[in-house]
């Protein structure tokens, strides 16, 4: 895993996940659980402290890699977002690209990256 981190192979068996982290059969743009962000993180600044997300995973971050920090978690404590201190690496477990047509606030993630590469 990137920068030396590792994963739970099954968040339900290994991490005690209780939220719905697999979207099926719910439509892709409909949120299935909430995420809470860490104050001061980029995700917190752009999307707020708490928001609803879609979900398509059964694996999850166990230990983030070097220089990465957990900045978002679901209510069952599954990692939903990580960031590097310099703000150039941001990772999320949800799929904002599938939600932004119905939930335009998720476009802010893509706008942030577009500004970084200018």
Each model region followed by its residue ranges:
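Hydrophobic, aromatic-enriched interface-forming segments
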Residues: 1-3
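Amide-donor transfer/coupling interface in amidating biosynthetic enzymes
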Residues: 12-118
């Amino acid at each position: 895993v990137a920068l030396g981190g590792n994963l739970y192979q099954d968040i339900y068996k290994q991490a005690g996940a209780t939220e719905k982290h697999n979207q099926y059969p719910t439509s892709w743009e409909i949120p299935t659980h909430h995420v809470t962000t860490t104050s001061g993180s980029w995700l917190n600044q752009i999307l707020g402290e708490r928001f609803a997300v879609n979900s398509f995973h059964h694996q999850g971050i166990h230990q983030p890699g070097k220089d990465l920090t957990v900045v978002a978690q679901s209510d069952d404590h599954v990692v939903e977002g990580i960031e590097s201190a310099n703000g150039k690496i941001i990772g999320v477990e949800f799929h904002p690209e599938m939600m932004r047509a119905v939930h335009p606030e998720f476009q802010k993630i893509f706008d942030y990256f577009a500004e970084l590469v200018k």
